[in-house]
C-alpha cells in the first residue's frame, strides 16, 4: 500500500547530510544515463501557477513527480512516487521540507566539487526558508568553512537568521559577496550580486531566480567566471534569466555551459586554479525530489513512520 508522509515526518527522517548523499548519487546516475528528467511545466492559475516536474530513475526503479500550486494564498508541494516494475503508487509525500533539503544539497555538492581548496567563508544573500538549508548543507559538505556572512533587506529577518545559523550580519549585499563561497537565494527580479564584488577564487551558487524575467546576477558575474555550470541545460534554457539574457547579449555561449553532473562524474574539471571564479546556476530537478523522496520512504518503512493509504 502507498505510504503517506507529512512535513514533520520528513523532517524527522532526513538530515542535510542524508540529502547530500542522495542527491550526489542522483547526479552520478544522471551522468550514467540512468535518469530521465523532465523540466518544470507551469500552468497559470488565478494569479499564480500550477507547476509539475517529473523524473524516471531506473537506478532506483522509481518514477515520480513533484506538483505544487503557487498562488497568492500560499504554496503546497507534493511528491508522488511510482514503482517502475509494477506501476504501483508507492508514496505520497508532503514536499516543502523535502524541497528545501534537496535544494540545499545541490549547493553543498557544488561547493564540495567546485569551491577552492581550503575555503573558509560562506556568504549568503537572502535569509528565507531556502537560505537555511544552503548554509547547513554547505557547512556539511565543506568542513573547512567556519564563517558565514548573511545579508537581506529585512533587518528583523536578518537578525533572526544570524542567531539561528550562527552567522554574521552583513551591512550591504557586498559583504557576503566577498566570501569564498557565495550563495544567492532570493526572490529578486533584479541582480543582487555584482561581479565586481567577487574575490578571486570565489564559487557562486545562484539558487533563487527561476524565471526568464528574473535575475540574481549581473553580466559581470558571467564575464568573470572561468567555468559555468547548471543542473540542467534544457531546463535553464526555459527558465534561467541569469543565463539566457547574458547568452542572448553575447556575454556567454551555451557551448560554454556545463552540467554539474559532468563535474561530479569526473567527466570535466570545473576549477582549474585557486583564483578561478566559478558559477553554479540551479533551477532544481525533479530527479532530486525522486531520489530524496525514495530515501525518506526507505527510512519511514524501516522505522514504522507514516500512514498507509
What function would you assign to each model-found segment?
Residues 1-100, 108, 115-118, 287-290, ...:
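N-terminal ligand-binding/catalytic initiation module
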Residues 114-121, 144, 199-200:
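Short helix-loop-beta connector
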Residues 127-128:
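Glycine-rich Rossmann-fold phosphate-binding loop(s) that bind the pyrophosphate
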Residues 140-165:
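NAD(P)-binding Rossmann-fold cofactor-contacting core
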Residues 166-180, 193-196:
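Short acidic low-complexity segments
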Residues 181, 188-203, 215-219:
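Rossmann-fold NAD(P) dinucleotide-binding segment
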Residues 200, 207-269:
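Rossmann-fold NAD(P)-binding glycine/threonine-rich loop
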Residues 275-309:
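C-terminal helix-to-coil terminal segments
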Amino acid at each position: 500500500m502507498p505510504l503517506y508522509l507529512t512535513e514533520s515526518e520528513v523532517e524527522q527522517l532526513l538530515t542535510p547530510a542524508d540529502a547530500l548523499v542522495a542527491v550526489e548519487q542522483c547526479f552520478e546516475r544522471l551522468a550514467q544515463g540512468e535518469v530521465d528528467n523532465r523540466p518544470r511545466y507551469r500552468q497559470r492559475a488565478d494569479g499564480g501557477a500550477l507547476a509539475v516536474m517529473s523524473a524516471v530513475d531506473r537506478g532506483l526503479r522509481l518514477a515520480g513527480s513533484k506538483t505544487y500550486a503557487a498562488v497568492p494564498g500560499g504554496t503546497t508541494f507534493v511528491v508522488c512516487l511510482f514503482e517502475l516494475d509494477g506501476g504501483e503508487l508507492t508514496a505520497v509525500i508532503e514536499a516543502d521540507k523535502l524541497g528545501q533539503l534537496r535544494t540545499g544539497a545541490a549547493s553543498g555538492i557544488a561547493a564540495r566539487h567546485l569551491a577552492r581548496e581550503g575555503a573558509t567563508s560562506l556568504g549568503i544573500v537572502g535569509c528565507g526558508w531556502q537560505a537555511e538549508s544552503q548554509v547547513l548543507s554547505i557547512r556539511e559538505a565543506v568542513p573547512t568553512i567556519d564563517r558565514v556572512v548573511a545579508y537581506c533587506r529585512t533587518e528583523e529577518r536578518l537578525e533572526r537568521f544570524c542567531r539561528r545559523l550562527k552567522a554574521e550580519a552583513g551591512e550591504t549585499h557586498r559583504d557576503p559577496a566577498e566570501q569564498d563561497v557565495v550563495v544567492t537565494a532570493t526572490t529578486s527580479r533584479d541582480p543582487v550580486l555584482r561581479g565586481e564584488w567577487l574575490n578571486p577564487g570565489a564559487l557562486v551558487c545562484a539558487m533563487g531566480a527561476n524565471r526568464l524575467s528574473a535575475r540574481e546576477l549581473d553580466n559581470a558575474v558571467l564575464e568573470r567566471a572561468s567555468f559555468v555550470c547548471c543542473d540542467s541545460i534544457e531546463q535553464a534554457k526555459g527558465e534561467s534569466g541569469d543565463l539566457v539574457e547574458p547568452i542572448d547579449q553575447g556575454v556567454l555561449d551555451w557551448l560554454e555551459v556545463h552540467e554539474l553532473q559532468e563535474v561530479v562524474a569526473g567527466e570535466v574539471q570545473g576549477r582549474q586554479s585557486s583564483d578561478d571564479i566559478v558559477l553554479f546556476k540551479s533551477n532544481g530537478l525533479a530527479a532530486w525530489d525522486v531520489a530524496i523522496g525514495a530515501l525518506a520512504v526507505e527510512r519511514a518503512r524501516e522505522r514504522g513512520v507514516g500512514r498507509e493509504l
